[in-house]
A protein has these predicted regions:
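Glycine-rich, acidic/polar active-site loops that bind/position phosphate-bearing ligands
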Residues: 166, 174, 211-218, 259, ...
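Extended non-transmembrane interhelical loops and adjacent amphipathic helices
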Residues: 136-140, 262, 296-300, 304
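Active-site recognition of the HExxH zinc-binding catalytic motif
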Residues: 191, 320-341
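Short pre-active-site segment immediately N-terminal to the catalytic Zn-binding motif
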Residues: 253-259, 308-330
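Short alpha-helical functional segments enriched in proximate histidine and acidic residues
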Residues: 220, 224-227, 269, 336, ...
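Long, K/E/R/D-enriched contiguous segments that form extended
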Residues: 230, 234-278, 282, 304, ...
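A well-structured
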Residues: 1-252
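Catalytic zinc-binding patch centered on the HExxH motif and its immediate surroundings
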Residues: 252-257, 290-311
Length: 341
């Protein structure tokens, strides 16, 4: 293996990965807004099966690269023409102690469509179908009640959410336990020293960095305690319950925020920080890169979904018009701007 051959192989892999990433992004986003649609679900499954086949046929590259003698690998990485892929190749070698045999890695790639992704798909389908309360509301519509100034409305929303989840507790618990068990088995087979090591490697973080952060946050739990004690006083309640956590503080702004008002609030805030950031964020509105309405079958929550460097990201929110939704959109747009850059 010489430097030129390595460059060609990584370039070919990049081309395949980018094409596959586009297909996966389209299939996932097409499905996630209509989880009950059979055709959308079938398309996502087909793309995941294709990704598994491609993964099985290309997994050899990472395995062989990681088996290369360290001195030889560093020599190849030191070539000036390798600069484009140097970081990618160095990051791959961090996983060398945890890779399995070629046959085992190929088998795991083959099983991908019926492993973690299948359970995640089942979870998304389940939540896309869940309805809460006598009015049959969606998850996002019920969660919106938790931000209502009327405590009775918040309590009703919490009760409806709990009741709806309890009816599906057996299935949700099974999904959660299965995913946890798969993670445990994978960590054991790959000889990770702790449950978080694989994630830290993927994030290119040292364990001690994450442990320091966790310790620092845990050591100041008193900040959260003081916050909720003060909120209890401001709300004037004898005891603070879970459905009071997001209650608006008396005297603050209330009422519905239209989509146009939301857009103005978010872009104005971004512009005060960086006009360039606001200009990029505005493209998400103008070019319709945001999916905002609450729809039956649409997944709850919010996210910014990247694609490839040559394609723009997308944002999903479930906009119900409260201040929480405005903050959520601003948060996701921050990710979106980052991904676009």
């Amino acid at each position: 293996l010489n430097a030129a051959a390595l460059h060609r192989q990584v370039g070919d892999r990049e081309e395949v990965d980018c094409l596959l990433a586009r297909l996966e992004a389209f299939a996932f986003l097409h499905f996630i807004t209509q989880t009950g649609d059979a055709a959308a679900s079938a398309l996502l499954q087909q793309v995941e099966e294709l990704a598994a086949r491609v993964g099985r046929q290309t997994v050899f590259f990472a395995l062989e690269w990681n088996r290369l003698d360290p001195a030889r690998a560093e020599h190849l990485l030191g070539q000036p023409e390798r600069e484009r892929y140097r970081h990618y190749l160095r990051a791959l070698r961090q996983f060398a102690p945890h890779q399995l045999s070629s046959a085992e890695e190929e088998l795991l790639q083959e099983l991908r469509p019926v492993g973690r992704s299948a359970w995640n798909l089942l979870f998304d389908k389940l939540f896309g179908h869940l309805r809460f309360g006598v009015d049959g509301r969606t998850e996002e519509e019920v969660l919106s009640d938790l931000h209502h100034p009327d405590r009775a409305v918040r309590r009703r929303g919490a009760d409806e959410l709990t009741a709806g989840l309890r009816e599906n507790l057996h299935l949700l618990t099974h999904i959660f336990n299965t995913l946890a068990a798969e993670k445990m088995i994978d960590d054991r087979l790959r000889r990770y020293p702790s449950w978080i090591r694989a994630r830290n490697l993927a994030n290119e973080l040292e364990d001690r960095t994450v442990e320091t952060l966790v310790a620092a946050v845990t050591a100041r739990n008193d900040i959260a305690h003081r916050y909720y004690a003060r909120k209890q006083q401001l709300l004037g309640v004898d005891e603070l319950f879970d459905y009071d956590r997001y209650a608006p503080v008396p005297g603050g702004e209330e009422g519905q925020v239209t989509w146009d008002q939301c857009r103005e609030i978010v872009l104005s805030a971004f512009a005060a920080f960086s006009p360039e950031m606001a200009a990029i964020a505005e493209r998400f509105f103008v070019e319709r890169w945001i999916h905002a309405p609450v729809l039956p079958g649409k997944r709850g929550g919010a996210f910014a979904h990247p694609c490839v460097p040559e394609a723009h990201p997308y944002i999903l929110v479930n906009y119900t018009g409260n201040l929480r939704d405005v903050a959520t959109l601003a948060h996701e747009l921050g990710h979106g701007v980052h991904q676009q850059l």
